[in-house]
Amino acid sequence: MMKHIPIFLFLFFASCEAQEKQNDIALQDEVVKYKFETVASGISNPWGMTWLPDGTLLVTEKSGNLYQIQKGVKTEIKNVPKVYNRGQGGLLDIAAHPNYAQNGWIYITYASSDGEGDGGNTKLIRAKLENGGLTSIESLYKAGPNTTKGQHFGSRIVFDKEGYLYFTAGERGETFVNPQDITRDNGKIYRLNDDGSIPKDNPFVGQKNAKEAIYTFGNRNPQGLAMHPETGKIWEHEHGPQGGDEINIVKKGANYGWADVTYGIDYDGKSISTMTEKEGVENPIYYWLPSIAPSGMAFVTSDKY
């Protein structure tokens, strides 16, 4: 039976003054009354959403459906690509181009079976919304090879102030294979031009066999990505194993350590690494022990709360 799940925006804020070693952000216990308004129901496992300039809300459903919501009316969008709906995979994030009003581009990530091998992996496309369906669909990036494992697809999308597109792909359960190898996809944050081409100043352009779209590596499963409204820097958060969820500021060519360093342990209680720091590895600006499984982030700029 379909569950009626209200959609609401979860806002997360973390102070940038936290010290990664002390992890000592002071949180005030404060009773705050919020009012939740249901804008749509009948969506099972909504995963990503984006607003269009006219106030239309686009929402992805993990199973593969895409909806537009206008003035409380929910309509299913046609011609959505088939997704690899397994485990954590499916129809994932969606983002409107910063200049959507001029060019009409919408960007979508999803688990796709296209490409080499059985199973699926993270794919990025762009498309336009016309007459209730997706048109002009263009494939921008497909991580590979495919795998039948069901975990760690990423895959958040964000644009920076210069118009570059960032998206994430988790390490697909290949803990000791993908994250530290820049010749392989997964366990990475990617940076592209808005048409899917690779910026000439990406950190690994010209390196032999490197995936030139990679902007950072050593990431486990990044599911939060947001641009700081004042600095313009891209922040990300990612899932650790048992413990060790992290917040990081994205830096060009940086290694975020997975799985050479971690604050967490494996799900069977065994150690993954004895190190929480290592030369050449970026330390998180904040981490959680135990894990909270952060699944999305946004900066609060409103003065209403």
Model feature map: region roles:
Residues M2-F8:
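Sec-dependent signal peptide recognition
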Residues K3, K62, R126, R156, ...:
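Basic side chains
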Residues P6, Q70-K71, P179, N248:
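Short amphipathic alpha-helical segments
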Residues A14-S15:
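C-terminal motif of bacterial Sec signal peptides marking the signal peptidase cleavage site
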Residues Q19-T175, G224-M227, G232-G240, P290-Y305:
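Acidic, Gly/Ser/Thr-rich repeat motifs that build Ca2+-stabilized beta-propeller blades
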Residues K21-D29, G89-L91, N99-A101, R172-Y305:
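Beta-propeller domain segments
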